[in-house]
Amino acid sequence: YYRDYGPVGGIPVLLVMGLGGQLTFWPPYMIKRLQDSGYRPIAYDNRDMGLSTRFESSPTFLSNYLKYYLNIPIKSEYKLDDMANDAVMLLDYLNINKCHVIGMSMGGMISQILVANHPDRFHSYTQIASMVSTPNPTNGPSFRVIRLLQERAFKNATKEERIDRAVRLVSTIGMKGYNHNTKEFRNEVGQSIDRSKDDTGFIRQMAAILGTRDRVKKVSNIKIPTLIIHGDIDPLVKPKNAFHSHKLISNSELLMVENMGHLIEEPVFNKFKEELIQHLDKNC
């Protein structure tokens, strides 16, 4: 399922969302800024999320993490490569031969595969809060964040309980000094729950991340212009990952954003919006 925000004559920008995120998670102020700058944002629900195709296996969150750390093979219904192929099929369906791509978190991992495998299809790549290696104790989420992510796998929670745990998570992984527990945010979470009630897709997407392993060799072959945006206090994907990506991608620029966690709150977006548009403008 996708949403083409237009305008029709704008330069297409494919937006690839992260783990457990629906297309509605892209901030409206970011969408508007892209449109106002002459771009045509196109967002979509990754498989197993939102209104896109669902799979049926029921892996457990903790068992997959334990298997990964113990180097035990992880069974997943699909890999990140399959999710990248979904994006290519969407571009083909929309008759888009070439576009920009912006990937957030897991969406950045998917986008790395996209631009490495299909460099002729993309003007530029923007990586936000993502990584090249598979998450591990040295570069991945803190134990506290893992516990909060694990809560999402709990079944039979009420709608209000799910909203409360979303507030706990974003308050932990977002920028400091920002009130995430607002009526507006709680309403947005409630609408997302109503749009897509199944949380098992989140666990299957996590299995795809852990089962794909790292992409060091593939990412080192990326040649298209790349902008790497990362928060200096990101507790989910540690800042060191941004420097690693920058080192591997020869044609890349690195922008570390002060007091940015793993979210794009409006004050955070205001800190990098000019650099983002400049990156897109000079690589059309």
PLM region spans:
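Short alpha-helix in the alpha/beta-hydrolase fold that links the catalytic acid
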Residues: 224, 238-245
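Acidic catalytic loop of the alpha/beta-hydrolase fold
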Residues: 233-237
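Conserved HGGG/HGGXW glycine-rich cap/lid loop of the alpha/beta-hydrolase fold
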Residues: 1-70
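Conserved hydrolase catalytic core segment
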Residues: 97-137
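Alpha/beta-hydrolase
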Residues: 141-217, 224
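Conserved acidic catalytic loop of the alpha/beta-hydrolase fold
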Residues: 81-99
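Catalytic active-site module of serine/aspartate enzymes centered on a nucleophile-bearing elbow/loop
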Residues: 252-284
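Short beta-strand/loop motif that positions the catalytic acidic residue
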Residues: 222, 228-230
